[in-house]
Regions:
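N- or domain-start disorder-to-order transition segments that initiate the globular core
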Residues: 1-13
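Hydrophobic/aromatic beta-strand patches that form the interior of the parallel beta-sheet core
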Residues: 14, 42, 102-106
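Short, flexible loop segments at the rims of nucleotide/cofactor-binding pockets, characterized by
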Residues: 16-22, 80-83
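Short N-terminal binding/cap micro-motifs at the start of the first secondary-structure element
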Residues: 21-27, 52
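A short acidic, amphipathic alpha-helical/loop segment
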Residues: 26-32, 92-95
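Proline-aspartate-enriched helix->loop->beta-strand connector
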Residues: 34-45
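PAPS-dependent sulfotransferase catalytic domain
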Residues: 47-49
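Hydrophobic, often amphipathic alpha-helical segments used for membrane interaction and targeting
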Residues: 52-146
Length: 146
């Protein structure tokens, strides 16, 4: 999904929606960036994840995935080829590096997320989370779109 917004001052903002992990969405983003030529790229990950992606690109290492990431990848693979780290993030980093532009992470950092999580999660939420994870592992999904 792509949508361009024209601001009153003449600035254009392009919103690109992709599925985290699908290789084809990374390829679509790469093509979109080449056409749109942004001066700044914002991605829906925290700044610390951008640093990790850059380090990974310089010296790839084995990644450890959570249970949810494994389940997500397994289900997502029904819709196309999947890759970790997600190609949509990798392409954003590659583009920003190549054109020496600013890459902004716009999600909460780990400390902020942890604080919000601790302030809002209750014991029953954690129990529901465990039950939901168990159900997802045994659920059969029938969607034709990711």
């Amino acid at each position: 999904m792509k949508k361009e917004f024209k601001m009153e001052n003449g600035t254009s903002i392009l919103m690109f929606g992709g599925v985290k992990g699908l290789i084809r969405d990374g390829e679509d983003l790469k093509e979109t960036l080449q056409i749109f030529r942004p001066d700044v790229v914002c991605v829906s990950i925290p700044e610390e994840s951008i640093d990790s992606l850059e380090k990974f690109m310089e010296d790839p290492y084995e990644l450890t995935l959570s249970d949810y990431e494994i389940i997500y990848g397994t289900i997502l693979s029904e819709f196309g080829e999947v890759m970790v780290p997600p190609p949509i993030y990798m392409e954003a980093v590659k583009y920003a590096r190549h054109f020496s532009i600013k890459l902004e992470g716009i999600d909460l950092d780990e400390d902020s997320y942890s604080q919000v999580y601790m302030d809002n999660m209750k014991s029953m939420d954690l129990i529901a989370h465990s039950v939901r994870k168990r159900r997802i592992m045994h659920h059969s999904f029938k969607s034709t779109k990711p």
